Design a protein with these regions (language model features):
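Active-site hotspot residues in diverse enzymes, especially metal/ion-binding acidic/histidine motifs
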Residues: 1-174
Length: 174
């Protein structure tokens, strides 16, 4: 059996999406899904469910994202990117069979779930552009997080986490 390296595959898939589709921030996730022939639906669910991915033999894959008023747009974008990650990374687990996963806000995350989060992070905030924008906004550190999170279409929390991951400070002097 082939050893699964989800984190490396997540990085590769995100890189390929940006370069093959010539994406610009904020990443057009509907375009990414369309290229992969994934149907995307927005529906209101119970607040505990962010979204789900479903693949059945003989049918197009489906992603449903919770568009409840309690789920802000940056959260829905992250969920959609995460579910696209399930489409790409789930093939290693179940290439030709049924595959269903729904995501909730539970703190316990499997290796695959963490890899899908990584894919979503890298798809929404590629390293090269994150570093570039961070440097470009060095003259405006007090507003940098707000400007960058709006540019990438992500929450300030997700951006700060990405900046820490890249070793870029989010601390500003007062």
């Amino acid at each position: 059996m082939r050893k699964l390296h989800f984190a490396e595959e997540a990085e590769l898939f995100a890189y390929k999406a940006w370069h093959s589709l010539k994406l610009e921030p904020p990443a057009d996730l509907e375009r990414v899904a369309a290229r992969l022939k994934i149907e995307v639906h927005e529906r209101e669910f119970v607040p505990e469910i962010d979204g789900f991915y479903l693949r059945l033999p003989g049918a197009p894959p489906v992603i449903a994202v919770n568009n409840s008023y309690v789920k802000p747009l940056p959260r829905r974008r992250f969920t959609l990117a995460h579910e696209i990650g399930h489409h790409l990374l789930g093939r290693a687990i179940s290439p030709d069979r049924r595959y269903f996963v729904f995501d909730s806000a539970t703190p316990r995350r499997s290796i695959l779930e963490r890899a899908c989060d990584r894919f979503a992070t890298m798809l929404l905030m590629p390293e090269d552009l994150t570093r570039q924008y961070y440097q470009e906004l060095s003259h405006n550190p007090s507003n940098r997080t707000a400007i960058m999170s709006a540019r990438f279409g992500v929450s300030a929390w997700a951006l700060r986490r990405r900046l820490r991951e890249l070793g870029l400070s989010t601390w500003t002097r007062r």
